[in-house]
Amino acid sequence: MRFQGVGLCLGLLFITVNADFMDDGVEVEDFSENSDESNIKDEPSSGTFKYKTPQPIGEVYFTETFDSGNLAGWVLSKAKKDDMDSEIAIYDGRWEIEELKENQVPGDRGLVLKSKAKHHAIAAVLEKPFIFADKPLIVQYEVNFQDGIDCGGAYIKLLADTGDLILENFYDKTSYTIMFGPDKCGEDYKLHLIFRHKHPKTGVFEEKHAKPPDVDLKEFFTDRKTHLYTLVMNPDDTFEVLIDQKVVNQGTLLDDVVPPINPPREIDDPSDKKPEEWDDRAKIPDPTAVRPEDWDENEPAQIEDSSAVKPDGWLDDEPKFIPNPKAEKPEDWSDDMDGEWEAPHIPNPACQIGCGEWKPPMIDNPKYKGIWRPPMINNPNYQGLWSPQKIPNPDYFEDDHPFLLTSFSALGLELWSMTPDIYFDNFIICSEKEVADQWATDGWELKIMVANANEPGVLRQLVIAAEERPWLWLMYLVMAGLPVALVASFCWPRKVKKKYEDTGPKKTELCKLQSKAALEQEAEEEKAPEKPEDVQEEKKPGEAEVVTVEKEVIGEPEEKSKEDRETLEGQEEVSKLSKSGSEDEMKDADESPGSGDAPLKSLRKRRVRKD
């Protein structure tokens, strides 16, 4: 049981440290066991990788790697946001093309949002518009929150092909077809999938939001790794959202969006009104109830305490606050500009007991009852809650194929963030999953291999965690010391001496007992030398004591020390001498009354010398 308890403690310590690593992103574990990253074998350092700009292997609508080092084809917005001050309404956020801060792949660059707390907007035209018909839509790109993220987004907008789209005027209200990507503020982590659906009768566009993903998104915002975001929308009205090529959300456009695509068949009649005689009161005051005669509604809730007395030393004429006598007028004070200077007020030190007009404290009025109200009873005329009648929805429609959205012709990023250095790379829009997968293999997977090759070992990770949390050093020491202590206690067990209860007197106590008995006998015999009967009677108690002690000592365990054995031998000899002396004295007493002194005295002398 002892080893089981220690093992349990070790397990709890390991779980605690491991959970701490997970929270800090020191070593983030994949949320799926079938991770593609787990299949990537250990590679050498990033300096041995040969990067080649990804090339699409099939038909695409848009690709961008930023490896050229310039923003050719991209247009910075010059628009201003509506309903905002001109100073903060402009899109003046800065964009740069840079390599990753960590785990760089030589030659691989990306688009980086550089400004903090500014509006950013940039867009590029597709090679050809995407028309929703009979081909899937696949949108894929990479994001790395290099400095983490406090509040901001990294989503993209697929701008609607309206015919009058001007990218320099791109702003938050520009018409889009799909908005997709990560967004975070506070502790709210989101992965947006929003599309604008056109009402076939009214022509009004309405935003439809896909249900939230089924996984915890926090690690993708905090681990400072490059993650791959993929959206797949199929002509059969199904969709999938993937992170790092693993599905995190899926469903249908008809059933898994809010609000629903199709409106209700019936709606409340807007012209229907509740009848005046409709009684929807579930409870009413009891009409038969009468206010009691002694009910006084005029009594106040609180009254002055008539038993209160003004404390002695209360100063009625003293103010509670006085000007600070130590305050001085500032040198730069101008009476013309600042007005007449007045010293700040402080509590009056003379008002320790109280100052000003004294008033007795207020107490609850025992006679107070308040306004009388009759008790409530069930309404006999209750008709229930009224609701308007239903009528057919004049705007009802049934869209069985919501995949047929408005075509789009440009991709844009319209973002605001409190954290800079958000990295974007390897955009692709296509219709074939194989094309997108190969694009990810040539770009994103290479970043992952470099990151894995540069990943610190277990010991280094433990040191990094302890540098951020010094208390982990103590846990490491405990975890390292416990196995050593267990091995030591198992291999070199401590010798436990068996303790016996000391039932007999010690050697010194035995000697004292014998000496005391002998002295008492000697004193009594000197007082009455002519009475051998008394000597015999007095000798018996001493003999009994010696015999008793002897029995107790003999009853001890055999594991006695040498000293104990010597004590036993001495006790036996003393007992024998005592017995022989007693017998001799008895015989001498029978022969002559005066002959018992010499043997007794010699016996005492011999016993004392023996001790």
From Swiss-Prot:
One example of a Gene Ontology biological process annotation: spermatogenesis
Tissue expression summary: Detected in testis (at protein level). Detected in testis.
Keyword DNA damage annotated: no
Pfam families to which the protein is assigned, alphabetical: Calreticulin
Region (Interaction with PPIB): 317-350
Molecular function in Gene Ontology: calcium ion binding; protein folding chaperone; unfolded protein binding
Lipid bilayer topology: Single-pass type I membrane protein
SUPFAM superfamilies reported for this sequence: Concanavalin A-like lectins/glucanases (SSF49899), P-domain of calnexin/calreticulin (SSF63887)
Region (Disordered): 254-335, 517-611
Subunit structure: Interacts with PDILT and PPIB. Interacts with ADAM2. Interacts with ADAM1A, ADAM1B and ADAM3; these are protein-coding genes in mouse but may be pseudogenes in other organisms.
Family recorded in the similarity comment: Belongs to the calreticulin family.
Function: Functions during spermatogenesis as a chaperone for a range of client proteins that are important for sperm adhesion onto the egg zona pellucida and for subsequent penetration of the zona pellucida. Required for normal sperm migration from the uterus into the oviduct. Required for normal male fertility. Binds calcium ions.
Name of the protein described by the UniProt record: Calmegin
Organism of derivation: Mus musculus (Mouse)
Name of the coding gene: Clgn
